[in-house]
Each structure stands twice: as C-alpha cells, then as structure tokens.
Amino acid sequence: MHTLDSLDAESLRTDVPEFWPGDTLKVHVRVVEGNRQRIQVFQGAVIRRQGGGVRETFTVRKVSFGVGVERTFPLHSPIVSKIEIVSRGDVRRAKLYYLRQLRGKAAKIKEKREPVAR
C-alpha cells in the first residue's frame, strides 16, 4: 500500500450506506452560520457518483418551487453528518444527467422492487 493510500484510509468514513444513482436520499448537512451550527436536510435523487477513495463525491438533485437544485457533496466530508436512503431507484445509467431536461412525471424515477424471500 502506498503512503498516500494509507493516510487516506484513516480519514475514510465507515458509516456511509450503500447507494447508487437513482436512489432518493436525505443528506443531513452541517451548516455553520456565524458562531451557530445547525443541521439542514437536503432530499433528492442521486444523479451521479464520481471518483474514489477520499475524493469520492455524489450529486443530489431536487426540484424546489419549480426550480431544479443540484448539490455535490464530498462523500467522506465532515460537513455531511448523516445519509439516509429514502427509496431505491431502478435506472439503467450511471449518470442521470438526462433528468435535467425532463419535467413533471417524465422526471420520475421508477422504484426498484425487491424480491420477497419465501
């Protein structure tokens, strides 16, 4: 293992759930305003995951008051306090940039149906 890899391994988070593009997430973000600190929740669909290791990022898209909002978060950053999976999406692409042009029902992602154990 290289020296940089061993340094990076120390700062990797272990509490990150397994999620993919198409999944709907609630990202709890730590916001600092002056000397106060609060948690803000950003809920939307994951449109991409990029990079690897410490530098891995993911982008979440939501529509707020008719305007599309996208935020890119570093996966292992301390400003992301918690990631919750709301629902699993069924998509065939790794990058869902095409959602930017779609409106209304067309921009909806199908929910993945899990098989029931018998």
Swiss-Prot record:
One of its GO terms (molecular function) is structural constituent of ribosome. PROSITE patterns: RIBOSOMAL_L19 (PS01015). Keywords: Ribonucleoprotein, Ribosomal protein. InterPro entries: Ribosomal_bL19, Ribosomal_bL19_CS, Ribosomal_bL19_sf, Translation_prot_SH3-like_sf. Transmembrane segments: none annotated. Disulfide bonds: none annotated. It comes from the Bacteria. The keyword Ribosomal protein applies. GO terms for biological process: translation. One of its GO terms (cellular component) is cytosolic large ribosomal subunit. Belongs to the bacterial ribosomal protein bL19 family. PANTHER family: LARGE RIBOSOMAL SUBUNIT PROTEIN BL19M, RIBOSOMAL PROTEIN L19. This protein is located at the 30S-50S ribosomal subunit interface and may play a role in the structure and function of the aminoacyl-tRNA binding site. This is Large ribosomal subunit protein bL19. It comes from Frankia casuarinae (strain DSM 45818 / CECT 9043 / HFP020203 / CcI3). The lineage of its organism: Bacteria, Bacillati, Actinomycetota, Actinomycetes, Frankiales.
